Swiss-Prot record:
Species for this entry: Mus musculus
Keyword Transmembrane helix part of the UniProt annotation: yes
PANTHER family: DUAL OXIDASE 2, DUAL OXIDASE MATURATION FACTOR 1
Protein name: Dual oxidase maturation factor 1
Keyword field: Glycoprotein, Membrane, Protein transport, Transmembrane, Transmembrane helix, Transport
Gene Ontology CC: endoplasmic reticulum membrane; plasma membrane
Cytoplasmic side: 46-51, 205, 271-341
Compartment(s) of residence: Membrane
Extracellular compartment spans: 1-24, 73-183, 227-249
UniProt membrane topology term: Multi-pass membrane protein
Record: glycosylation sites: N84, N109, N121
Sequence intervals crossing the membrane: 25-45, 52-72, 184-204, 206-226, 250-270
């Protein structure tokens, strides 16, 4: 037994765990890499445009990273309690533990940490996830947890979210997660369209897409709050303590980001009405950039050249070649050679 480190051969040792969710780590790494890349090329931009460009990049990457991160986060609804409870089935021994419950859009995460960690000759430090996303079966994962022999507090909380539990937590949170996740994916697509439009001379439509991005984020919060509010109170008792849940960091970050998107969209809409030249200067676009518009008389696209001439308050000289070509276009002459220059 000494060769095994005082550990029974049929018990596996403590596995090393990554300090955070791997999906969130990948998302954060991707956006940080993009930010570092943009910062590297920042010295190549001259003047005040450098500061405006950096502000746009940081804000845009922050919004996109938040939308993706909260979609995979397990901290939409959280709870934490310190309790004295039983540790294993068919054992009268009690332990002092910190129990954490994190509910996300795709499942629940349960943490169990002993205070102190070493109790009953064991290391009490568990972090178990149970998912209900598409393609995952919560009931199967709960059955595997029973076979694995997880501690009683973990199994007790996991059992409350099973489909057959009388609490009804599974159906409500699963439905809320599906609707909220769908709204966040639409918000992410609106964010992509906003970035495309803000790089083109259609800034006002980019502002509209920012408004849509914020509205869909708020819709995700609305669906999550409305669906979870329909749940009847189901006490989560651990020994003599009761675990209560409340909105977590992911919920409040989504709310703040959604309000930020709406504010930016409104500012762009007002700036487009009041100060269009300053708005174009902020996005490093010249006020003289040609923009195709629909003609009011014939319903066709106006050429940028003629649109600038028509909108100019000063009289402008039209080149002879342009004037003669217009005359030839209007006259119905059977011979093409008379209109050649």
């Amino acid at each position: 037994m000494a060769a095994l480190g005082h550990t029974l051969p049929f018990y596996t040792g403590t596995k090393p765990t990554f300090p955070m969710d791997t999906t969130l780590a990948v998302i954060i790494t991707i956006f940080l890499t993009a930010l570092v890349t943009f910062i590297i090329i920042l010295p190549g931009i001259r003047g005040k445009t450098r500061l405006f460009w950096l502000l746009r990049v940081v804000t845009s990457l922050f919004i996109g990273a938040v939308i993706l991160a909260v979609n995979f986060s397990s901290e939409w609804s959280v709870g934490h309690v310190n309790a004295n409870t039983t540790y294993k089935a068919f054992s009268p021994k009690w332990v002092s533990v910190d129990v954490g419950l994190q509910i996300g859009l795709g499942g629940v995460n349960i943490t169990l940490t002993g205070t102190p960690v070493q109790q009953l000759n064991e290391t009490i430090n568990y972090n178990e996830a149970f998912a209900w996303r598409l393609g995952r079966s919560y009931a199967e994962e709960y059955a595997k947890a029973l076979e694995k022999g997880l501690p009683d507090p973990v199994l007790y909380l996991a059992e409350k979210f099973t489909p057959r539990s009388p609490c009804g937590l599974y159906n409500q949170y699963r439905l809320a997660g599906h609707y909220a996740s769908a709204m966040l994916w639409v918000a992410f697509l609106c964010w992509l369209l906003a970035n495309v439009m803000l790089s083109m001379p259609v800034l006002v439509y980019g502002g509209h897409m920012l408004l849509a991005t914020g509205l869909f984020q708020l819709l995700a919060l609305f669906f999550f709050s409305m669906t979870t509010s329909l749940i009847s109170p189901c006490p989560l008792r651990l020994g003599t303590a009761v675990l209560h849940t409340h909105h977590g960091p992911a919920f409040w970050i989504t709310l703040a980001t959604g309000l930020l998107c709406i504010l930016l969209g409104l500012v762009m809409a007002v700036a487009h009405r009041m100060q269009p030249h300053r708005l174009k200067a902020f996005f490093n676009q010249s006020s003289e950039d040609p923009v195709l518009e629909w003609g009011s008389e014939e319903g066709g696209l106006l050429s940028p050249h003629y649109r600038s001439i028509a909108e100019s308050p000063e009289t402008q000289d039209i080149p002879m070649s342009v004037a003669s070509s217009e005359t030839c276009f209007k006259e119905e002459h059977p011979k093409e050679s008379d209109c050649s220059l």
